[in-house]
């Protein structure tokens, strides 16, 4: 029994047997290798020496994989800080787009196409409805983030959209709907359903879909048609969460959710020779936390379901935040609303300065005497220092 275990420990214990008995994609295999070898020396080391006392320190490089639980904090802080320049001190709304669970096998079997279709359907829904004079009649600003997991690491693909509560009309005048979201949820639901199903049907008609694993039955024409009819008939349930209270609330949310992975180390509670216990929210019981125990191989299977396709972009910016509009349009919105400009704190800082600012830790100071630490030349990195010389 191991109480203080990490996801890396779980992979070391259970991944080899899982790999030998399961089909694994190249992206999943790469992520597993990175997680198991992060900060072990497999990705190189940096050796530094104190100018004053000669004490040496060895730093093992991280894997920098976006699925690794040990590698998210630093890129997250830099990304969120850069977004400060894009966020206005104005109301924002949080819209979540979900799909019927009947589609999950097809989506998992065609991740690149059908994740992309989620972005297309969500963004087209928001942009087209916002541009309609019946609702707002403007170009708006929003960020879409794909998550593929539920609290138990089940497969649950959905889009989080952070939507500015107003926009610019054709004359570049600002329009908003006060504190209320400017789009009816029922209209969003029907529009999103129509757009997603239309793209799914088009991919099917163009013979672009694959049917693996639990999606295999849908190779049959009539079974697939029945699935389409079932999903068309269902009421899709996107929902709008409580609005954000200004720019800082948006930034805090982005910091919490943008670089999330399926599960983090603090939720791992126990590991035995054959099982893993982790905490999860029970949404059938008012979102209270509970502990779940599953086999080690099942834990690996669930975790790897959420490794995105190679080079797949999970965070996307639209309309006023698109690269061709952002510099001019966001500045115009800021001037109209009288918002102060948020300046990036980390933009021109090097890594030691960022670590010093965020974590109050000076990695250029010797932990023994406080002297200045300097890096050793690369060719000396693999000269193992004697134990008494280590800080």
Model-found features: residue ranges?
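Beta->alpha loop/short-helix hinge microenvironment recognizer with preference
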Residues: 1-391
């Amino acid at each position: 029994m191991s109480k203080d275990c990490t996801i890396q420990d779980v992979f070391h214990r259970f991944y080899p047997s899982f790999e030998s008995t399961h089909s694994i994609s190249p992206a999943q295999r790469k992520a597993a290798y990175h997680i198991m070898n992060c900060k072990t020396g497999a990705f190189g080391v940096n050796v530094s020496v104190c100018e004053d006392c000669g004490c040496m320190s060895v730093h093992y490089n991280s894997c920098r994989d976006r699925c690794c639980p040990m590698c998210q904090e630093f890129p997250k802080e830099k990304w969120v800080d850069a977004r400060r320049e894009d966020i206005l001190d104005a109301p924002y709304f949080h819209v979540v787009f979900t799909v019927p669970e009947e589609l999950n096998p097809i989506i998992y079997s065609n991740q690149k196409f059908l994740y992309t279709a989620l972005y297309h359907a969500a963004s087209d829904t928001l942009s087209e409805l916002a541009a309609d004079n019946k609702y707002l009649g403007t170009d708006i600003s929003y960020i879409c983030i794909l998550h593929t997991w539920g609290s138990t690491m089940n497969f649950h693909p959905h889009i989080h959209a952070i939507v500015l509560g107003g926009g610019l009309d054709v004359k570049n005048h600002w329009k908003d709907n006060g504190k209320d979201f400017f789009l009816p949820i029922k209209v969003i639901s029907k529009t999103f359903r129509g757009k997603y199903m239309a793209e799914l049907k088009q991919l099917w008609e163009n013979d672009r879909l694959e049917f693996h694993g639990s999606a295999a039955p849908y190779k049959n024409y009539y079974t697939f048609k029945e699935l389409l009819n079932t999903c068309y008939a269902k009421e899709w349930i996107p929902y709008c969460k409580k609005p954000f209270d200004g720019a800082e609330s948006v930034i805090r949310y982005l910091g919490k959710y943008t670089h999330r992975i399926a599960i983090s180390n603090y939720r791992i509670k126990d590991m035995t020779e054959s099982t893993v216990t982790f905490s999860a929210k029970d949404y059938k019981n008012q979102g209270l936390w509970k502990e779940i125990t599953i086999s080690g191989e099942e834990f690996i299977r669930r975790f790897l379901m959420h490794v995105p396709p190679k080079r797949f972009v999970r965070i996307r910016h639209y309309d006023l935040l698109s690269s061709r509009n952002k510099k001019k349009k966001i500045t115009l919105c800021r001037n109209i609303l009288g918002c102060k400009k948020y300046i990036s704190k980390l933009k021109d800082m090097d890594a030691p300065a960022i670590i010093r600012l965020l974590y109050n830790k000076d990695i250029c100071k010797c932990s023994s005497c406080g002297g200045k630490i300097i890096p050793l030349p690369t060719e000396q990195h693999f000269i193992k220092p004697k134990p008494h010389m280590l800080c």
